[in-house]
Amino acid sequence: TYVDALPRMVSKFDHRIHTDYRQAVAATGRLSSNNPNLQNIPIRTEKGRQIRSAFVPRSSEYLFMSADYSQIELRIAASFAKDETMIEAFRNKRDIHATTAAKVFKVALEKVTPDMRRKAKEVNFGILYGSTAFGLSQNLGISRTEAAEIIESYFTEFSAIKRYMDDSINFAREKEYVETILGRRRYLRDINSRNITTRGFAERNAINAPIQGSAADIIKIAMILIHKWLEREKLKTKMTMQVHDELVFDLHKDEQDIVKPKVMELMKSAVILEVPMEVEVGVGKNWLEAH
């Protein structure tokens, strides 16, 4: 998919690879990449890591810099739901998955085991995507009964999240659309369908689309702010890629001390939420090293 295809897509004019970004493909509003798609190059497999290491900056005067929003969707969910437990955890820079595990399994934070944290992480993300007890049991390799108990405990401890989910579905039923943080709408005509499968799909979108869509809004605002700043300051550093919650730059070596903190500042302040944004920044000789 990549090893054979990517070398053939190198431009004969500047000897670089150029992708196309489209705004109107993904229903959530996230940018999609094609020709070639640079947003789905794996990083967890050894081959994927080798492929990422093949991406290098434009010349020896540059490094790669990766700036990645940390847990942006969970932060947006906590902000939308006004869940005090989650908000407090994010404000105090606590491990959100360990915090969730402590609440769900009713143990002290320091007593949370790696297995508890793993299950809590799956619940944190799964709930936002409408995960059921069956889905959770499959993903975690546990019984459906145990999965149902975990979800019930989660909703008891994080009642504001449950309220947000119910309110989102009710809003969508009335309006037949949901909105992102900046007011961009996703229409859900099937939310009142008599077909339970069709309706269920729309209900899951009613919960998740405002969150995913708001994440898309926020990173686009950040991209505009960063681009304008780079142009205004006449810097040599260039923004080269957007991979969902990550921005990748050709960072000029002489500009590291200026660009790194400013990019973090602009990304964190793109849209102000109830919880602070966190941005993880890495620098390296190639994309793998920078991530």
Provide a role label for each language-model segment.
Residues 1-291:
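Conserved catalytic core of nucleotide polymerization and phosphodiester-bond processing enzymes
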